[in-house]
Each structure stands twice: as structure tokens, then as C-alpha cells.
Amino acid sequence: MTKTVLLIGGDGFIGTHLKQKLTDQGHSVNVIDKKSNRDINNEYSFITDINFSHVVFLAAEANLRAVKQNPKEAIKTMTSGLMNSLINYPQAHFTYISSSMVYGNWDSDSVHEYSAKAPIDLYGQLKLAGEGIVRELHDHWTIIRPTAVYGSNDDPRRVMPFFIERARNNETLTVKGHSN
């Protein structure tokens, strides 16, 4: 069965890969992204003439340094942009791409859906708040909490591409954190 999918924030790392996969499977895919002059903080940016079966919300500032440098923009996109998206597509199944950052620094070898949420930075706090907004404002939803994602065409400023490039160049890797 062909789906009509809207990727909000679909020009980012995960979105470009997801768009390719969905298109390869024969689904109809549309994208809203600030990179293509459609800002979800502007109510006129939404596509309203298509009845989407699925909406995937990927919009976020994935670079933690950028979140710290411009928290106002991150907050706007990850809260009011999210609410605009939920309000504009009440009929669609809504998938919210959250983050494992909602758990903060966990002490066990693994976490699960019901593990304690204790975000340690603004990004994790905004993702956790987004989950609550989705649960409150939409009837049909899925929340996904990926861990560190990386792969081809990743932003070289992110940690995994940085580590991979250092390793390829046989350079020292410095990892800061707790040693327990």
C-alpha cells in the first residue's frame, strides 16, 4: 500500500536517507525544511493541499554546539514548530524523532522505554518536552529515540565523523567523560 508521507526537517541527515528509502519503496514523499525555504515556525510554510497518511517530524538542531550558541532558535523549532506541525496534520500518523539524550547519562549497560529520563542539556530537555507535546496534542503517534546516528553524507562537525576522520588520519582521539 502506497503511503503519502511528509518529512518535516527532511533535508537533514536522517531525513535524506529516509526520503530515499521511502521513495525506493514506492511511497510519495514531500519535504518541508528551512534549507528549502519552508520554515515550520511560519504557519504559511505548511503543505495543506495533500492529505498525508504519515508525517515524520525530524526538525531539530542536531549540532549541540549550535543549540548552545542559539538556544532561542532551537527552542522555537523544537516546540512551536512541532506544535504547528501537529495542528496542521491531525489526520496523519505522526512519528516524532526524539533522541536517547532524553535519558541523560545512564549508569546501566542499556536503557529501555521506561528508563528514567534525566536530560543533561537543552537538546535532551527539548526532545523530552517534544515527546510530551506529541502525546498531548495528537491521537496517532510513534516516538523513536535513536542513539548517535552516523553514516554517509553526515555533517563533518558532528562527533562520529570527527572521530572517524581522526582515526583515518592516525591522529589521537581525545574522549572526555567520566572514568567509571
What are these regions (language model features)?
Residues 5-25:
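N-terminal Rossmann NAD(P)H-binding glycine-rich loop of SDR-like oxidoreductase domains
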Residues 29-47:
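Adenosine-cofactor binding site in Rossmann-like domains, unifying the SAM/SAH pocket
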Residues 55, 69-94:
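NAD(P)-cofactor binding segment of oxidoreductase domains
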Residues 56-62, 98-100:
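Conserved NAD(P)H cofactor-binding loop of Rossmann-fold oxidoreductase domains
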Residues 64-81, 111-119:
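Short alpha-helical oligomerization interface
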Residues 83-122:
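Conserved Rossmann-fold NAD(P)-dependent oxidoreductase catalytic core, especially the SDR/UDP-sugar
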Residues 126:
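Active-site helix of classical SDR
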Residues 132-180:
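NAD(P)-dependent short-chain dehydrogenase/reductase
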